[in-house]
């Protein structure tokens, strides 16, 4: 079983659906939800070798961490996210490699 990180994208952090929808989805994930994560504030900074720039083009709006047997399973679980009903909402799924 591996760990997978969900990075959420919506218009703004407040566009991500209501707490009841998120609670229902998290409840459905059961013990596979390792860390419900947090929403991000609107904006962020990208640090480059040459400096720092504000993230303006579709910044991430939050994260969660789940466990799954495969990328396919983690991706299938993400399809139930409340952001799927939000215009331009998206969930990016990344596998966290063991160190």
Set out the residue ranges of the language-model regions.
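Conserved, structured core segments of small domains
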Residues: 1-99
């Amino acid at each position: 079983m591996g760990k997978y990180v969900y990075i959420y994208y919506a218009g703004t952090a407040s566009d991500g659906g209501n707490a009841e929808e998120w609670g229902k989805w998290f409840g459905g994930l059961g013990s596979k939800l390792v860390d419900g994560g947090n929403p991000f504030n609107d904006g962020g900074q990208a640090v480059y070798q040459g400096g720092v720039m504000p993230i303006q083009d579709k910044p991430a709006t939050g994260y969660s961490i789940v466990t799954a047997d495969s990328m396919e399973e983690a991706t299938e679980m993400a399809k139930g996210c409340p952001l799927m009903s939000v215009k331009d909402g998206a969930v990016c799924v990344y596998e966290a490699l063991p160190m």
